[in-house]
């Protein structure tokens, strides 16, 4: 089934974010090989060049590493993984707070809502 993309951001960034979330959630473990460009392109129903660009972005961030002709692997560097996790958490919190501000909800009110909705 093809992945769903939005028109507000480049597709390669959405693919990179999805892979990042898969890594940080543990779907792909540190040191584990990730699917190939062709596999992900078929799964996402996009051009392989788009997936390649997403992979380049992730390699630049240090989240994945390329091992010659063997393939691409999740880094096993815990500092990089933790840094990526913190960066993503900050981004999500910023987006959340922007949405709360649009609703005229204060930080205190947002915290109260979060505490009430703990999973």
Which residues does each PLM region occupy?
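A short alpha-helical element within helix-turn-helix/winged-helix DNA-binding domains
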Residues: 33-44, 58
């Amino acid at each position: 089934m093809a992945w769903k993309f939005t028109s507000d951001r480049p597709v390669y960034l959405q693919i990179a974010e999805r892979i990042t979330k898969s890594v940080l959630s543990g779907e792909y473990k540190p040191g584990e090989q990730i699917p190939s460009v062709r596999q992900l392109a078929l799964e996402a129903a996009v051009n392989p060049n788009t997936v390649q660009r997403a992979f380049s972005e992730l390699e630049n961030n240090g989240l994945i590493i390329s091992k010659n002709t063997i393939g691409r692997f999740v880094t096993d560097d815990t500092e990089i993984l933790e840094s990526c996790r913190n960066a993503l958490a900050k981004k999500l919190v910023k987006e959340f707070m922007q949405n709360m501000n649009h609703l005229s909800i204060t930080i205190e009110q947002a915290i109260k809502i979060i505490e009430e909705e703990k999973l």
